[in-house]
Each structure stands twice: as structure tokens, then as C-alpha cells.
Amino acid sequence: MMETMPNWLKQRAFLTPDRTAIEIEEEKVTFMQLHEKVVSVCEHLTHVGVNRGQKVAVLMKNGMEMITVIHALSYVGAVAVLLNTRLSREELLWQMDDAEVICLVTDQDFEAKDIPVYSFAEVMNGPKEEASIQEEFSLREAMTIIYTSGTTGKPKGVILTYGNHWASAVGSSLNLGLRDDDCWLACMPMFHVGGLSLLMKNIMYGMRILLVPKYDADFIHKALQTRGVTIISVVSKMLTDLLERLGEGTYPSSFRCMLLGGGPAPKPLLETCVDKGIPVYQTYGMTETSSQICTLSADYMLTKVGSAGKPLFQCQLRIEKDGVVVPPFAEGEIVVKGPNVTGGYFNREDATRETIQNGWLHTGDLGYLDEEGFLYVLDRRSDLIISGGENIYPAQIEEVLLSHPMVAEAGVVGMTDDKWGQVPAAFVVKSGEITEEEILHFCEEKLAKYKVPKKACFLEELPRNASKKLLRRELRQLVEEM
């Protein structure tokens, strides 16, 4: 098996220098122009002492600047630690400390404690020093670290190598195919693996990306009709928004794939897509699998409703219960394997050993396979709340609630929301006088906005089993009765 590959963007700029790489609003950048921008940033990163193997935090919104910085870090051999712009300052500082980053590159007004902070203007236009650019990428080396929340609530840094990203892009192309006129509309945040994976496909396939800096359903709807877009990645909420705008019409015949992630889609939504001739491919994946690992092709949209499909060509999947592989229709844990699967978590040897055994990743998600091998995901890590495509772990919110002196006990579950799918709801046992408003305000200071509970209810005691474990299912019943 090959150990190295030519520097991806540099090779792409050599092969197709004048082809459009990125379109953003009215700006177009070719692969050669992108390469030149990246080299300029490299020279400043070298000047400030960024070296191979060091970790650099990136806190930026979707845009040409973020793309340039991510590629520049790969050019100098540094590891990009991609931070979620929606997190609170405390959460960001914790992740930067945990990842042992040496500096932060950001397009925001952010003051870190112990590390230098550089704006994009500084890294683009600041003092330069000749950079030692990686001519080859070692597929075993780490390229990115992206944080994901564990069931304990403490985030874990998922290490993704050049080999993981390469395998993910190859698997996707074998699944969806490639066309010369392909253009992928990118509206997912690039700090998420789903958004980042499009940057990899962009340079590996030589495919045009239409980049949307911020989710804008009107712009996206119009772009699908007028900008030659052939593929887009969405979650159910986005698909619903687009169908509302589409009315009685449909999208051009050149549009060939609506890649749908973030949990199963409602059957009526899929039926509407079939009626309008919109091909929807449902997917299952996570940060640890470098994006999708299973996809249900549009051929099975209605005959396999609720299924996430079958594994990508070079991937394997099975269902285990108590360490034993179970037969079709038996429920158990989804376990996956493939060259796109992470080798582990940064500085979390115990979590890595627990999660990855003999190359198989234990996802913590529950599901089953039917008699034809199609995957059905039953629960995304049973306690997980998925709100507008964002993963929220109750344990992290509970940790914040319990840090308040007037809170004795806390339990958090998801409650149904028409707009976001789910939002957090908190149940609290008081140890002193406190109001719902005070609790929510306290959370706003400590958590990202989308993690703040939409409701806080007071109980005399939380439901627990004999071993005092919180019974979340009873809290869910209380939410349903509200």
C-alpha cells in the first residue's frame, strides 16, 4: 500500500491550474490562484514559528480565508485543530488547552490566555519567511483534529490522518460517481467533518465548490436553479426549507444528488422529493469515520424508508451485542471498520482502547441490519440530542447546571421542536431559591447558544433506578406530557 502522496492542492494546481476551484458569492478562484494564496500564508506561518507536527487552532467561519488557512497548515505539515464557532469562550479555551495548540488563527475578536492569536489579515499580509513546503503527504500523519462530545460530556479530539481523508473521498466517489461538470454546493460549516470533507473532494477530484459562507435557504434555492450545482449536502431541516421554496417546480435535470445526513428523514418528505424528481441519498457517518460511512442510494428512497443504506465500498459494518455479531433484524451496537476510520482520540488512550478494538470502531449507536444488509439506525447514542444537525450531549449541560450552587440535581433530555427537530429541556432539583429564568441565564454564560435548554422544570427528585442511575426515559415521558 502507498505510504505517501504528492501534496494534494499543489498537485491539483499543476494538473488543472486554470480550472475554477472555489466560487463564493461573485468571486471565482482557480486552483493555481488558491495555491498561490496558500503559499503566501505558509510564509507567514513559517515566520511566526509554526513547524511540522505542531497543532494550530482554527476558529473561522466558512470562507476563502478558512480554506486558505487549512491548506496552508497542511503545506507546512502542521495539524489543524478545527473549532466550532458556535461554542462559548470557555469551551473553546478548554479545547485549545486539551489539544496543546501553539497558536490560534481566527477571523473573530478572540483573546486567548497563553497562546498567540493571529487574524487572517496578519497571516496573509504579515512578515514572510521562505517556507519549507511539504512536497509529499504521509498518509499515516495527522492532518486534522476535530472535537466530538463523548457520552461523559467531555469533548474528545478525533485525529484524522491524510489517509483517512483520502479514503473518505475515494469511497464517496466510488459511491456517487464523478462527472466533469460536477459542482458541490458547500453550506455545512467546515469545522464539522461533513463540511471539511468537501474541501478534500474539491482538490482530489478537481471539482468546483460553490461556497456559502452562512446558511441562507433563499440563496441556496436560487443557486440550485441557476449556478450549475450538481450535488449538495443537507440535513432534514434544510431539505424542508428548500422544498417550501420550490413550490410546484423542480430542480434542473443536471442536479443529481441531495446528500442527506443528520438522522433519518420523515417519509412524507421523501415522497415529496420522489414526486418532484429530486434524488435523495441518505447517509450515516460521524467525525470518527471522516464523514459518511454508509449511504442509501436514491433507488431505495421509498422501498427502504428509514435506512441509512449500505457501507461504502472499502468499508465494513456489523451489529454486535455483548461482543457477539447478531443476525438480521436483531438490535445491537453499530460497529464499523475502514481506511476512513480514525485511529483514535488525542491524548485519550483509554477512550481509544474502549472504542476501537482490532480496527473496529464501536460507535455507541444502536441499530440493526435487514436481510439484505441495509442499516437502520435506531438511536444516535441513546441520550444524544440532535438539534438542527448539531450534536448535543445532555451530560455536558448537566455538568454546567450542577456547577450552580442552588442546583442539587440536574437531568437533561431532548424535546421535540418544529424548527430544529429537537432542543434541550432541563429538569432540576433545587438546593436553594432559584428561578427558571436565572437557570437559563446561567447556562447562556457557559454554553453555546444551541446547547442552552429551552425550558427548565423543577422536580422534588429526579427518577432513578436502584443503582441511582438517572432514568432519562422517564424524563422524556414528562416532556411528552407537557
Curated annotation (Swiss-Prot):
Keyword Ligase among record annotations: yes
Gene3D superfamilies: 3.30.300.30, N-terminal domain of ligase-like (3.40.50.12780)
One Pfam family of this chain: AMP-binding_C
UniProt keyword ATP-binding present: yes
SUPFAM superfamilies according to UniProt: Acetyl-CoA synthetase-like
UniProt KW keywords: ATP-binding, Ligase, Menaquinone biosynthesis, Nucleotide-binding
Catalytic activity as recorded in UniProt: 2-succinylbenzoate + ATP + CoA = 2-succinylbenzoyl-CoA + AMP + diphosphate
Pathway: Quinol/quinone metabolism; 1,4-dihydroxy-2-naphthoate biosynthesis; 1,4-dihydroxy-2-naphthoate from chorismate: step 5/7; Quinol/quinone metabolism; menaquinone biosynthesis
Similarity comment text for this entry: Belongs to the ATP-dependent AMP-binding enzyme family. MenE subfamily.
Function: Converts 2-succinylbenzoate (OSB) to 2-succinylbenzoyl-CoA (OSB-CoA).
Name of this chain's protein: 2-succinylbenzoate--CoA ligase
